[in-house]
From Swiss-Prot:
InterPro entries: CCR1-9-like, Chemokine_CXCR6, Chemokine_rcpt, GPCR_Rhodpsn, GPCR_Rhodpsn_7TM. The chain crosses the membrane at residues 34-60, 70-90, 105-126, 145-165, 189-216, 233-260, 277-294. The keyword Transcription regulation does not apply. Keywords: Cell membrane, Disulfide bond, G-protein coupled receptor, Glycoprotein, Membrane, Receptor, Transducer, Transmembrane, Transmembrane helix. It is a multi-pass membrane protein. PROSITE patterns: G_PROTEIN_RECEP_F1_1, G_PROTEIN_RECEP_F1_2. It comes from the Eukaryota. Belongs to the G-protein coupled receptor 1 family. Glycans are attached at N17. GO terms for cellular component: external side of plasma membrane. This is C-X-C chemokine receptor type 6. The keyword Membrane applies.
Amino acid sequence: MAEYDHYEDDEFFNSFNDSSQKEHQDFLQFSKVFLPCMYLVVFVCGLVGNSLVLVISIFYHKLQSLTDVFLVNLPLADLVFVCTLPFWAYAGIHEWIFGQVMCKTLLGVYTINFYTSMLILTCITVDRFIVVVKATKAYNQQAKRMTWGKVICLLIWVISLLVSLPQIIYGNVFNLDKLICRYHDEEISTVVLATQMTLGFFLPLLTMIVCYSVIIKTLLHAGGFQKHRSLKIIFLVMAVFLLTQTPFNLVKLIRSTHWEYYAMTSFHYTIIVTEAIAYLRACLNPVLYAFVSLKFRKNFWKLVKDIGCLPYLGVSHQWKSSEDNSKTFSASHNVEATSMFQL
């Protein structure tokens, strides 16, 4: 969903000179091609990746740890999120033809799953912190933690629904040269933006910085040949989050405090490009939080064999050998309780 207000409003740009209006028209042509293409790329990649994670987690991997509970809800949220993108892609090329009810529904679904995804990423970070730093306690309370994890996931979905109500209530179809589905309410827009920035960026970012800093310190004092691999994964997770989410959130923050940027066509380009980059998280989450696990990759090849897409080619033995070798790694006696560190 394009996060802008005036791009399609020709009346907004009629007050500017001919050169500015020409730049605006060029931008509109660019956005009609760029955003729908990016939406479809994210949709296809996110659909395939998150569907694989869900199928393997439910039918092959089972729920063996608290992280596994989160890794079922994360691809579910991302999967529903990417399923809204074809609608926004079509509306970007043409106009909104799906009516007001679908407008409110898709705005709600889009926002709910955005918040859910970010909050679950935060919970995964905290869970990894507990398992690595407080390994013995986590191991002894594994059953209790599983129960609490399911409750936490339910609460996350409820909280996401509640904070998405403004988009659902105030979302509507507007006629700005063409029909557009968007959320727009000046009175509460500041509160909505603050909620988006807090739950969707600052909370997961600060949690990652604090928790992963302590985890890195713990791993540096741990033995095992897989220590460096785990550190690389942590740095990769942080780098992907910063590179995909920071630019768009920074642009939104600037836009909310400096309205004069609306008159700059170059700033409009910045918004849609950073927005597209931010949406890549829905494609990358399956790789960062599932496919890094040897057990998950082994189950993936089992799925490939079961559906008959490719010959097995002795893959099972390959992963079995790698998995046995990985078990020599230990930052504590039960680091393997999490999906991330079953590398």
